[in-house]
């Protein structure tokens, strides 16, 4: 029986050497929220704790300034 191996998750921000996550960078932030608008946890994305906190703060700021929606499930 073949064994499947799970690819190791890595923090994209650490590998790229990002100093701080900017709340105005909507393209990057959209990769870390679900279709319904929830913030994706670090155990799924592999983001380190330092950058997960910055990411959450940036997403919340962008939501407050109406750059990102709180939810996309409006009907």
Curated annotation (Swiss-Prot):
PROSITE patterns: RIBOSOMAL_S18
Transmembrane segments: none
This protein's UniProt keywords: Ribonucleoprotein, Ribosomal protein, RNA-binding, rRNA-binding
GO BP term, example: translation
Official protein name in the record: Small ribosomal subunit protein bS18
An example Gene Ontology molecular-function term: small ribosomal subunit rRNA binding
GO CC, one annotated term: cytosolic small ribosomal subunit
Subunit structure: Part of the 30S ribosomal subunit. Forms a tight heterodimer with protein bS6.
Pfam families recorded: Ribosomal_S18 (PF01084)
Organism (species): Shewanella denitrificans (strain OS217 / ATCC BAA-1090 / DSM 15013)
Family: Belongs to the bacterial ribosomal protein bS18 family.
UniProt superkingdom: Bacteria
């Amino acid at each position: 029986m073949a064994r499947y191996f799970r690819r190791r998750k890595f923090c994209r921000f650490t590998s790229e050497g990002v100093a701080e996550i900017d709340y105005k960078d909507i393209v990057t932030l959209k990769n870390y929220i679900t279709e319904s608008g929830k913030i994706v946890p670090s155990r799924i994305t592999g983001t380190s704790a330092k950058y997960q906190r910055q990411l959450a703060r940036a997403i919340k700021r962008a939501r407050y300034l109406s750059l990102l929606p709180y939810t996309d499930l409006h009907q």
